[in-house]
């Protein structure tokens, strides 16, 4: 099964997440199919907090991909901002 989920990057105590399409059996930070955005929870000032290609999300969901709970809320936020 294919899922759209977050992979963690960044330094210790300074998380930065990539939003990726991955097989649900692969490790959290392992192999992925496509990178479709990023999420920076600690963005300050003019830094971009969320960038997400909503068209690609819609395309993958149409193909049967599931969204993780957190990604579903981020997609909702991205649609509201656009």
Swiss-Prot record:
Keyword Hydrolase: no
GO process terms (BP): translation
Key word Protein biosynthesis present: no
Short name of any one Pfam family annotated for the protein: Ribosomal_S16
Gene Ontology cellular-component annotations: cytoplasm; small ribosomal subunit
Keyword annotations from UniProtKB, A to Z: Ribonucleoprotein, Ribosomal protein
Any one GO MF annotation of this record: structural constituent of ribosome
PROSITE patterns noted in UniProt: RIBOSOMAL_S16 (PS00732)
Family, as annotated: Belongs to the bacterial ribosomal protein bS16 family.
Protein name according to UniProt: Small ribosomal subunit protein bS16
